[in-house]
Structures are given as structure tokens and as C-alpha cells.
Amino acid sequence: MGSCSPQLPLICLSDQTLKPGSSKWVKVRSDVRKALEDYGCFEAKIDQVSMELQGSVLKAMQELFALPTEAKQRNVCPKPFAGYFSHNGLSESFGIKDANILEKAHEFTQQLWPEGNKSIKMIQLYAEKLAELDMMVRRLILESYGIEYFIDEHLNSTYYRMRLMKYIARPDNDITAAVGANVDNGANDNADGDANVNDDGASIGVKVNVDVGDDVNDNDSVNIGVGVDINVETNVNGHLDAEANGDATAWVVGAVSGNASVGAKEANVDAELGLPSHTDKSLSGIIYQHQIDGLEVKTKEGKWIRVKPAPNTVIFIAGDALCALMNGRIPSPYHRVRVTEKKKTRYAAALFSNPKEGYIIDSPKELVDEKHPRAFKPFDFVDLFNFYHTEAGRRAPSTLQAFCGVSAGK
Ligand SMILES: O=C(O)CCC(=O)C(=O)O
Ligand SMILES: [Fe+2]
């Protein structure tokens, strides 16, 4: 309240009043289209998920992440990175395919708790509610472009995957100073997903963490801003590994690293990022951040909007597959996670919708006209995802553009 920091559009999708065909529905439909065309995402106020269910899901997540590593690693998926994944000690996540369907979600229980566990029921119920919400939003989108005939085919061509995330709390006993580091301009620069910085050289913010121990200095006010020689390896943008099903994330493997010398003491240079900037590969994602903020979304103007968590609020975000399907009319925004609160563990849950394997994504002809010439060639989502794992896919400023952009000339 009263804050002038930029915010995402907030749209009320509350069940009580939103009935198809009602005047509220028509208004929400145009709000959804406008928000997505402008930002590729919006905040949604919802009442479909009770506080009780939210609490149960949080408890289930805490229980899951507290399992011994060997148990967590049983959450495997034939595709790499789609199961349990630990990212440089900064975050860890589980993946649950078809989390909204009870029988399928039970496969996840089998992996982690062969003796059975009631938590999965809560997670499944939660996924079911978010899936209903997601389908409503995708229905609103297609209606808003006047392609109602396509709704059933579209909804039937997709499935869901849930991702549960824990961002590990940073300790409190370090001194930090923000510094800017310029890395060479080149193909790798935009492995952080930032396609807009190519011409100016990519500037990345890195954080110098100095562990002030007795052996270094008793004085906590060490001035590390002076004489710190930062050597940030350009492998900051080493390579990105996408989630195997392509639904969501590009993780940087081998994050920002380098050394800074402070007197005789070595300090680690590390990204503050819990999750580097990326676009989701999915059609859509619904993200719920529990109490601790961290999610930031990039606007078309290149500004980062930090999304504040609220109990009955989720974020709807468009992915590359939706961008392609909608002939580029809806962008898939870059977003990242920066957990700035110390000593606080951040939990987040996201439900992604993906096109089924074998389904060809092709913009309906109604979305193509003189003002909007066809932007992408038809493709199978699996192929987009596989391309993402190639060197060329990783280096591309925009995976989607490089893979199937009409201007890519392939
Ligand atoms: O943790 C979050 O808030 C977002 C996670 C995310 O962007 C992803 O999993 O693709
Ligand atoms: Fe994401």
C-alpha cells in the first residue's frame, strides 16, 4: 500500500462471481488478454484454494525436503532434471508429472514413501485446484481472441507437471557488498536468458560474500568495496540446463563463480540468484510463493518487478509454447528468483501445463494477419525441448526464435 514500486496487473479470478458468460467474465477476459500481451503474466487473486489446504501443502513440502538425500533422489523421471534436482546448494526441487491426477500422483508417493503417506493427497488436491484455474485462464485467453472452436482441442492436448521448490536460507554471518561486473559481449552473455543486453555488453550483478571469521578481522565493518579484485569467470553463463520435460526452468549449472581477495582472505563471489533469469518452456505456469518473496519478472522495458507474496494470490505466467501457439501475441517473460531475506527458507510451488508429446503446436489462422504475420513454424514440443539441450539451443538468445522462428530462416 502506498508503495510506488512497479507491480504486475492484479486480476480477481475468484470462483464466487466469475461465471462463464457473465459480465464479470467478459471484463476479466479482456483484462487477462491485456495483462498477458503487456507482461506475459499477471497476479491472480483466488479463493479456490483454502488457507487450510495451503497450510497442508506447506507442511507436506517441509516433510518432503526434510527426507534424507537418498530418499529424495528416488524422485526420478526418465528425462533429466524432471525429478529431484539440487541446484548448487542454493535450491532443490521435486517434479511430479500429472500431479493433479490422484493415481498418477501416487507414483510419486511410491518413489519417496514406499510405505505410503497422506501428504500426496494434499499436493494432488492443490494441483487439481490450480489446474482448474489454469484451464479457466487458457479458456479466457482463447475466447478473447475469438477462437472458441479451438478450446477443447487445445485443453485436451496438454498435461500438467508440478514443481515443488525450496530455496535454502542464506546464513546471517556474512558481510555482503553488491558489485557490478561486466562480462564480454557474446553469445554466452544471454545464457541468463537476457536477450536484450546483447548490444551493450551484459552487465551482471554479483555479490561478494565475505565470511568474517576471527582469523580475518574482528571488525565487522570490513570495507570490501576497496581493493577487491573481482574476477568473474565468463562461465557465469556456462550453460543452462532445462527441466527435462521442458515445462519450465532453465537452471544455470555452474553458477557465477570467481574469487575476490580481501587482504589475505579469500572471499567467494556468488550470485544472489536462487534461480537465474529464464523463460519457461511450458504453455503456462501458476506459481505460488509462500510468504517469502523472491520472484522477479522482467518487463518489456527491461525493468524487474518483484512480486510480493500474498496468501490468496498466485502468478499466472506464459511460457514459450504459449507464445508460439499465440503467434507471438503473448510473450513469455523472463523471470528469476532472488532470495534476499537471510535465514529464511523460501518455499514455492508451481504447476505447469505442457503440450503432449506428438501434438503439433501451430498458431490458429485467426491469429495470423497482415499486422501479425506467422512468426513460428509448427513444431512438436518435445523437439523444442531437445533443441534446448543442444549447444546451439543453450547459446541462443531466444531458444524459441532459434528453433522455430520464421525469421530464423531454417
Ligand atoms: O520459485 C519461483 O517463484 C519461480 C520458479 C520458476 O520460475 C520455475 O520453476 O520455472
Ligand atoms: Fe520459471
UniProtKB/Swiss-Prot annotation:
Its cofactor is Fe(2+). InterPro entries: DIOX_N, IPNS-like_FE2OG_OXY, IPNS-like_sf, Iron_ascorbate_oxido_reductase, Oxoglu/Fe-dep_dioxygenase_dom. Its EC number is 1.14.11.-. Fe cation binds at residues 278, 280, 335. Residues 258-355 form the Fe2OG dioxygenase domain. The keyword Metal-binding applies. 2-oxoglutarate binds at residue 346. The keyword Iron applies. Keywords: Dioxygenase, Iron, Metal-binding, Oxidoreductase. GO terms for molecular function: dioxygenase activity; metal ion binding. Belongs to the iron/ascorbate-dependent oxidoreductase family. This is 2-oxoglutarate-dependent dioxygenase AOP3. It comes from Arabidopsis thaliana. The gene is AOP3.
